[in-house]
Amino acid sequence: MQHIRNFSIIAHIDHGKSTLADRLIQYCGGLSEREMESQVLDSMDLERERGITIKAQTAALHYRAKDGQRYNLNLIDTPGHVDFSYEVSRSLSACEGALLVVDASQGVEAQTVANCYTALDLNVEVVPVLNKIDLPAADPDNARSEIEDVIGVDASEAVLCSAKTGLGIEEVLEAIVARVPAPKGDPAAPLKALIIDSWFDNYVGVVMLVRVVDGVLKPKDRILLMSTAAQYPCDQVGVFTPKSVAREELSAGEVGFVIAGIKELEAAKVGDTITLATRPAAEPLPGFKEIKPQVFAGLYPVESSEYDQLRDSLEKLRLNDAALQFEPEVSQALGFGFRCGFLGLLHMDIVQERLEREFDMDLITTAPTVVYEVVLNNGDIIHVENPAKLPEVGKYAEIREPIITATIFLPQEYVGPVITLCNLKRGSQIDMRYHGRQVQLIYELPMNEVVMDFFDKLKSVSRGYASLDYEFKEYRSADLVKLDLMVGGEKVDALSVIVHRASAQYRGRELAAKLRGLIPRQMFDVAVQAAIGSHIIARETIKALRKNVLAKCYGGDITRKKKLLEKQKEGKKRMKQVGNVEIPQEAFLAVLRVDEGK
């Protein structure tokens, strides 16, 4: 026990977590030269391509320290992106220590702070590491003072290293051994193991990544999952040295995997406690809070015959992604599909991309929306995540929208444009602090303003230097209305959006104009209208294509021409009564791309 160290690496995106993990694995001989590749722990193609970590991964390393002892180091690599912050808290709850990696040239950024506070809340020992000191722009002293200023962690003994060149890696390992406490736990007590993560493997079923707190777990033991009371025979236990290696047993303080022939992922819930059926623990370990999706969007197959395939694909994805939620829904415009819940926009983007890549699906996505609280006239409260499900205008007393608290870090010179952007998005400033060259802005913003395109806009007004972290605060009453779009007098449910009354006229006009350009011309006039309730606020007309019926009259009598024109008019009128308009895929995406106040 004294020679085990469990630690994870936390940092802002692109501060070098995965590279540092590579170096530590290489230094401790976890993989041979041939198997070593960059970002070993990012196993998904998508993770590699975007250069982000999505799933937390682990590696068990052996390190002979300068005091001559051999230590077992369990490394858990965590994602840095705000959408995956729950992955971070899960990883941290399995550790006693965390390496706080800060890019010496960038200083402290938003996720650095958020993740570090998560670590401190869980009583994890934080070891600051200044990375990228080989860069000419590196300024370790400034980074040190920012860590002390902003986070309040003592950084006088921060380790300097460069994960790219391998400089200072030994010092990092020594710091882990010296400063991270050994795990506490009793190998003789009844087994308690926390499930940190679980995923589905095609050959062995569900693989659970666990941290053993008390007791010992061996193959052939019957295990009991405490939240569902289900029992399974344990087939295999082991550790990842990124590759999986089977072991005789996992004992208190260790992190490893358990395979127990479980077929469905729902059975192995993350945050659940595993114990032995023969000698169960009295009470489970404190788990994690359930993750609630923040952003909803409809996913529909382009070919309606692929509906079943889409359902299977979503179910397979959910095996690896506990946060994804979906339920079937029907849209008059798009047919059968699913309403999916995501943690944020990046998560939505990634799920969509994985469906298209790994499962070959062609998808139509509707505009992302957040969950609104609607107070009905009789006082009942319902939650609405789909604009089409909003009750009619007289049926409810008020709509409340989710408000988030956003923390934005940015260099001083971009404060003006960022404040302007936040005000455009109906934000209210709570606080503003200066830390050296960096400014920390704290704003309250309505979540549906953030969902659309806030992140992209923030990056563009600050040239990519601003970083954002947000958390849900509360539901607050607002003057919101449902904007319907009608094509040829028919409501298109998939194009409805919920907007603030102040920007409704503008949005309505913009959307109608956009759709006019996207819907192909028909043989008859098509009206594109934006409406709030029964009140039409904007209209555009798609002009009909017409044949020149007078081409065959050379000269001739005016009454003859009139007769032909009248006949054409009659025909168009009849077509208009029976004609229906095909709406192209681009039209659904247009809803996403209407810019607020240009």
UniProtKB/Swiss-Prot annotation:
Catalytic reactions of this protein: GTP + H2O = GDP + phosphate + H(+)
CDD domains recorded: EF4_II, EF4_III, LepA, lepA_C
Location, primary (coarse class): membrane
Q: What is its EC number?
A: 3.6.5.n1
Provide the alphabetized UniProt keywords. Cell inner membrane, Cell membrane, GTP-binding, Hydrolase, Membrane, Nucleotide-binding, Protein biosynthesis
Domain of life, per the record?
Bacteria
What's one Pfam family the UniProt record gives for this protein? GTP_EFTU
Gene3D superfamilies with a match to the protein in the record:
3.30.70.240, Elongation factor 4, C-terminal domain, Elongation Factor G (Translational Gtpase), domain 3, P-loop containing nucleotide triphosphate hydrolases, Translation factors
Q: Name one GO biological process term.
A: positive regulation of translation
Q: How does it sit in the membrane?
A: Peripheral membrane protein
The residues that the entry says bind GTP are: 14-19, 131-134
Q: Which family is annotated?
A: Belongs to the TRAFAC class translation factor GTPase superfamily. Classic translation factor GTPase family. LepA subfamily.
What's the name of the protein? Answer: Elongation factor 4
